[in-house]
Regions:
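Oxidoreductase and adenylate-handling cofactor-binding alpha/beta cores
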Residues: 11, 83-97
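E1/E1-like adenylate-forming module used to activate ubiquitin-like modifiers
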Residues: 1-80, 110-111, 115-120
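A short, charged, Gly/Pro-tolerant segment at domain boundaries
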Residues: 94-119
Length: 120
């Protein structure tokens, strides 16, 4: 989901000092198989600069040109994205140890890689 409504929600959360996590999923079809990236972006009072400086959250309106927008629903990828977001949320509140304190994480499907960035 994108667009102006999402921008307003994010701006209000930032204004009120509320931490939040935004997730995204992009997939593409290539040679009869899907590839793509899952994204988990965390915003806290201590670290919000990466939201603007690195455009970590998309506010674009979906144009329907990517394969995910064409109603490809991949339950396992949606579940993984949600699980990674919940794990990060629990790290924020001390339930899990957080050595890297990353505020951005990307999972690439084809390489099975987790990449962390935007550490405190």
């Amino acid at each position: 989901d994108g667009g102006e409504a999402k921008r307003l929600i994010v701006e209000k959360l930032v204004e009120l000092g509320i931490p939040f996590i935004d997730v995204g999923l992009g997939v593409e079809l290539d040679n009869e198989s899907l590839g793509g990236i899952l994204r988990i972006t965390t915003s806290t009072v201590e670290n919000r600069e990466h939201l603007r400086s690195k455009d970590r959250i998309s506010f674009s309106v979906e144009n329907g040109n990517d394969d995910y927008s064409k109603n490809i629903q991949i339950a396992d990828l949606n579940a993984l994205n949600a699980a990674l977001a919940v794990i990060k949320w629990k790290k924020l509140f001390g339930f899990y140890r957080d050595l890297e304190k990353e505020n951005f994480c990307a999972y690439t499907i084809d390489g099975n890689s987790l990449i962390n960035d935007d550490q405190l």
